[in-house]
Amino acid sequence: MRAVVTGGAGFIGSTLADRLLADGHEVAAIDNLATGSVANLHGASATGRFEFVELDVRDQSIPAVLERLRPEVVFHLAAQADVRVSVDRPLFDADVNVLGGLNVIEGARAAGARKVVVASSGGTIYGDPDPSDLPVDETHSQHPISPYGVAKKVIDDYLFAFRYLHGADYASLALANVYGPRQDPHGEAGVVAIFAGRLLADEPCTVFGDGEQTRDFVYVDDVVDAFARAALSGEGVRCNIGTGVETSVNLLYRTMADAAGVADGPVYAPARTGELQRSALDPSFAGEVLGWRPTTSLTDGALATLDWFRNR
């Protein structure tokens, strides 16, 4: 299979590229390097079956590049991925995540790709669900409360429309809180990368609010396994990719601190306005249509993440 990964120099995208190459496929990565890094591509570049294209997904040449590459599958992971930026700069967010996404989807269709697999956001497209609905499944109403979540929902709607109009196949993977090696603790990072960087630097970690807010933390290798499976299974579907388990920020901190050999507790700061209190995604449907399930425990994932940060 020949595949294109947009956002291919990023945390998840580069890990996906490595997985696809390990499976024997040819891979081209497209990335503007705004947040991605060529350092993430060293292993891929050594395979002889990899090409890197430095390009923004909003660029008008995207369709021509995809026409030249002629991929069977396009994995669209490039994004403006910071919810706070989307609130402060909604036009910029829509430019990248809606118009950029549509540019890729239309380019893939015109280039004859048999499928587009996109990274959606299970943490935002469902809005702020009632705790009694957790873990949420794919039948839950979608009422996103951030421009970022709105943009992700819009792309799902475009994919549905393109399948109806053109027969263009797709899978949309609604990701929980992804963590693991290569996540940037100084960029659009999740709390795991931030904690890892600070714990290893012997710096205090800040927890906002009382720390009892929950998230569904899913390890990056499990996530890219879902993407690889979605290239082959699941027609016109949206699947939640998470563990179904709520983990409090306090428990996450203690797990990571213990793994790092740090006895001290975190520093608590006032809660941030608008932050979701609880979140978890039901992955059962992904098990049915993709044959996927998460296999990495939080403890094992935290250890692997800390090891990577320690040795990079």
PLM regions with names:
Residues 34, 39, 192-193, 224, ...:
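Short alpha-helix within the catalytic core of nucleotide-sugar-dependent glycosyltransferases
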Residues 131-134, 185-193:
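A glycine/serine/threonine-rich, flexible loop-to-helix segment
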Residues 36, 88, 96-99, 139, ...:
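Residue-level signal for the nucleotide or nucleotide-sugar donor/cofactor binding architecture
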Residues 16, 56, 181, 197-312:
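C-terminal substrate-binding subdomain of Rossmann-fold SDR/epimerase-dehydratase oxidoreductases
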Residues 1-178, 304:
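N-terminal Rossmann-like NAD(P)+-binding domain of SDR-like oxidoreductases, especially those catalyzing
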Residues 154, 158-162, 195, 252, ...:
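Hydrophobic alpha-helix immediately C-terminal to the catalytic Tyr-X-X-X-Lys motif of short-chain
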Residues 45, 78, 108, 187, ...:
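Hydrophobic aliphatic residues
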